[in-house]
């Protein structure tokens, strides 16, 4: 039993390290992009510090999102939780709200297309069935 727990702990640690490495890589890429745009340099220590702060903030966001969902007696985080998290940044909240509305609109359009297609298929199958009945009567 202890070996299983140790193995799970090792897997979690490995996963966490990979996540941190991915964040560090992404921060490094963003810093390079900003550096080339602004004609400046970022030290490795600065990139590492930004990466650590970013990772820590993401952990806090994840915990907050879990708490918001749990408070609403849900086990799934939804867009309302994300909006609540972003409430202090008006520009971010506006962006998230707009994207959410865009996605909702796309979903409505897809649903309408699917419904129309289904109705057309049903109409066609009824018409072909009626045509088959007429032929058999003749």
Swiss-Prot record:
Positions carrying N-acetylmethionine: 1
Compartment list: Nucleus; Chromosome, Centromere; Chromosome, Centromere, Kinetochore
Source taxon at top rank: Eukaryota
Region Disordered, residue ranges: 112-138
UniProt keyword annotations, A-Z: Acetylation, Cell cycle, Cell division, Centromere, Chromosome, DNA damage, DNA repair, DNA-binding, Kinetochore, Mitosis, Nucleus
Gene Ontology cellular-component annotations: FANCM-MHF complex; Fanconi anaemia nuclear complex; kinetochore
GO molecular function ontology, one term from the record: protein heterodimerization activity
InterPro entries from the UniProt entry: CENP-S/Mhf1, Histone-fold
Record's keyword annotation contains Acetylation: yes
Gene Ontology biological process terms in this record: cell division; DNA damage response; DNA repair; replication fork processing; resolution of meiotic recombination intermediates
Role summary: DNA-binding component of the Fanconi anemia (FA) core complex. Required for the normal activation of the FA pathway, leading to monoubiquitination of the FANCI-FANCD2 complex in response to DNA damage, cellular resistance to DNA cross-linking drugs, and prevention of chromosomal breakage. In complex with CENPX (MHF heterodimer), crucial cofactor for FANCM in both binding and ATP-dependent remodeling of DNA. Stabilizes FANCM. In complex with CENPX and FANCM (but not other FANC proteins), rapidly recruited to blocked forks and promotes gene conversion at blocked replication forks.
Subunit structure: Heterodimer with CENPX, sometimes called MHF; this interaction stabilizes both partners. MHF heterodimers can assemble to form tetrameric structures. MHF also coassemble with CENPT-CENPW heterodimers at centromeres to form the tetrameric CENP-T-W-S-X complex. Forms a discrete complex with FANCM and CENPX, called FANCM-MHF; this interaction, probably mediated by direct binding between CENPS and FANCM, leads to synergistic activation of double-stranded DNA binding and strongly stimulates FANCM-mediated DNA remodeling.
Protein family: Belongs to the TAF9 family. CENP-S/MHF1 subfamily.
Name of the protein described by the UniProt record: Centromere protein S
Organism of origin: Bos taurus
Gene this protein is translated from: CENPS
């Amino acid at each position: 039993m202890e070996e299983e727990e140790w193995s799970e702990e090792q897997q979690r640690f490995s996963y966490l390290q990979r996540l941190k490495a991915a964040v560090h890589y992404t921060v490094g890429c963003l810093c390079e992009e900003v550096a080339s745009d602004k004609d400046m340099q970022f030290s490795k220590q600065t990139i590492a510090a930004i990466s650590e702060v970013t990772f820590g903030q993401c952990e806090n966001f994840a915990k907050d999102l879990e708490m918001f969902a749990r408070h609403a007696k849900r086990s799934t985080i939804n867009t309302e939780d994300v909006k609540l998290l972003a409430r202090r940044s008006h520009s971010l909240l506006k962006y998230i709200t707009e994207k959410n509305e865009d996605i909702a609109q796309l979903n409505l359009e897809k649903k309408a297309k699917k419904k129309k297609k289904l109705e057309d298929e049903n109409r066609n199958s009824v018409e072909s069935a009626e045509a088959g009945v007429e032929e058999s009567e003749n």
